[in-house]
Amino acid sequence: ISHQSIANYCKSAAMCIKPFVDHYDYGTGNVFTADETYIKIRGVKAYIWFIMDAAKRSIIGYQVSDNRGVGPCILAMRMAFRNLKELPSHFKFIADGYSAYPLAAQQFFYELKDPFKFNITQVIGLTNDDAVSKEFRPYKQMIERLNRTYKASYRPTNGFDNIDGANYDLALWVAYYNFLRPHK
């Protein structure tokens, strides 16, 4: 079996599994955490956006993009909010200090009004220099661990040949992470 045959099998499996993973109702809690990390596609940086439900540790939103702008962040958030009619009470959305997250939150309020009005709790830096960082650092560490877990499986690929390959790989990995991998 050649490496191309395996790539073709993965593509076929991803096309079957992705709709299930994307539309599954994960029964989310009231704390979401988000981050982005970079990958390489033909030696050029691309980005993967993750949004995770902190209680169940399920990936509820993800996106591969060729840029780090607000657009891919909004797409990942749309996926995360897909099964919600309104935000849970005491909702928290925790991210790093990157400006795309508050801009995406503004877009949701602009489009959907009060049922989706929320603020981003930004945990900035590596140390607990303020009360917000001290309180919410465990959530940021949770999403950073997710990034490292993904990168551990991504590293042996030496990058992707195209964005489709990155999307297929990510869909299969999210299915593995959410449904097959044991969560502690």
Q: What are these model-derived regions, one by one?
A:
Residues 5-27:
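Short, basic alpha-helical nucleic acid-contact segments in DNA-binding proteins
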Residues 11-12, 62-86:
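Active-site beta-loop-alpha junctions of metal-dependent nucleic acid enzymes
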Residues 27-42, 50-52:
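Two-metal-ion RNase H-like nuclease active-site motif
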Residues 41-47, 54, 58, 143:
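Short, flexible loop/turn motifs enriched in small residues
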Residues 88-103, 123-126:
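Acidic/histidine-rich, metal-coordinating catalytic segments
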Residues 97, 109-138, 142:
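Conserved beta-strand -> loop -> alpha-helix junction used to position metal-binding or nucleic-acid-contacting
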Residues 133-183:
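Charged alpha-helix within mobile-element recombinases
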